[in-house]
Amino acid sequence: IKGAETAKDTASLTYSKTNVQVENVDEADIIKNDGKYIYTASSNSENKISIYKPDGKKAKLMSQIEYNNVDDDENEAFISDIYIYNNSLIAQSYSYDENSWEYTNIDIYSLADIKKPKKIYSFSQQGSYVSSRITNGKLLVVSNRYISSDLCKTDEDYLPKTKINSDEKSLSPKDICIVNDSNSESFLIISEIDILSKENTVVSKAIAGAGTNIYCNENNLYIANSIWDDKNQAHRLKDISPILKFNTEIYKIDITSGIKFTAKATVSGAVNNQFSMDEYAGDFRIATTASDEKSNDINKLYAVSYTHLR
């Protein structure tokens, strides 16, 4: 039957992909599928990446990457998630250096020989991994780097650091943004890696602040962080049953040409996750949850115009 053959042919060409929030913006996952091979990242005791080729009811193991992307065996890197892009495997991991600083790591492997993936590029930035996205041939990586006076022995230790193929350097002060009303004790580090260029050129910048969730489209990156509203501290100290009040800070970054911090806003309530945020018709929309005087949850929805972001 001709129709049945067409359906069969169509089915053979389909395969599952990562469920992403925004079209043309890829998100990392522990399992990826490119239609030919299945890639898995094991973050448990195995700590490795495996590549399989589906073969009927079975899957043939093609190769594995035993994961440890730091020179010192005592400071092992632990896999977070992966991407498959432009015939390359991009692995994201975290590790700690000899001074206990946490790093977010990016390793790019060529898949030209699927049986022998070859590492062609390594990049690290200080801080705990928040999230990442791929859009327009660029990998965006976000991390939180807390400022620890115990670990900072010199003035330069306070500056965020990045590392390309083991060559470490501090961010220039001109690449660090501090908002006027900021009293943050941490830095948000945002890096953009051109994964289509042979050099894998990277741009890194930082802003005084922190983040827990991100929303990204092809033009803008938003980073949200729910914080305790310390303006209510005196009220809470007098109240036997204090009501915890939270605000959410939103940082907007233009990613159309490099990384450009453009605005900051604050709304009432705490944001749940990335799916509580989006951009529509020129406005940034965010849903938060707050509490009233009786500790009842109140859901709030904000549409923030760009002109109001400061």
How would you label these PLM feature ranges?
Residues 10-47:
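Beta-strand-rich domains and repeat architectures in extracellular enzymes and scaffolds
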Residues 17-21, 61-71, 120-121, 201-205, ...:
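A short beta-strand motif characteristic of beta-propeller blades
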Residues 40-66, 243-245:
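Beta-propeller domains
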Residues 45-46, 96-99, 146-149, 228-231, ...:
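Short glycine/acidic-enriched loop and turn motifs that connect beta-strands
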Residues 76-81, 127-131, 210-213, 272-276:
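Repeated scaffold domains used in trafficking and secretory/extracellular systems
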Residues 80-156:
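Hydrophobic or amphipathic alpha-helical targeting/insertion segments
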Residues 151-191, 234-247:
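Predominantly five- to eight-bladed beta-propeller fold
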Residues 307-308:
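Conserved small/polar residues in nucleotide/adenosyl-binding loops
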